[in-house]
UniProtKB/Swiss-Prot annotation:
Cysteines paired by S-S bonds: none
Function: May act as a double-stranded DNA (dsDNA) mimic. Probably regulates the activity of a dsDNA-binding protein.
InterPro entries: dsDNA_mimic_put, Put_dsDNA_mimic_sf
Family affiliation: Belongs to the putative dsDNA mimic protein family.
Pfam families assigned to the protein according to its UniProt record, in alphabetical order: DUF440
HAMAP family xrefs: Put_dsDNA_mimic (MF_00680)
Descriptive protein name: Putative double-stranded DNA mimic protein YE2228
Organism expressing this protein natively: Yersinia enterocolitica serotype O:8 / biotype 1B (strain NCTC 13174 / 8081)
Amino acid sequence: MDLNNRLTEDETLEQAYDIFLELAGDNLDPADILLFNLQFEERGGAELFDPAEDWQEHVDFDVNPDFFAEVVIGLADSDGEEINDVFARVLLCREKDHKLCHILWKE
């Protein structure tokens, strides 16, 4: 993988959020979608992290943080606080030539 051909942090967040919006209707409960849409403006967010260790339980490849990022999408109790109502955790390959993503949805 090429370290010089990676998505920026902003591009990674934007791409993960776009994928979330595209697939949420098929993977989230309608009540959760309504809540997210009503509250996102005030309490919503997407946060970028190195991949959590538990991804190894869900995927069969190395989630090297040089090439993968985890984006947590959800709602916080108030603006500026940490997301505590997680709607999706998106594992995204940051290399531009490899379109790989895996999502753990709210149950």
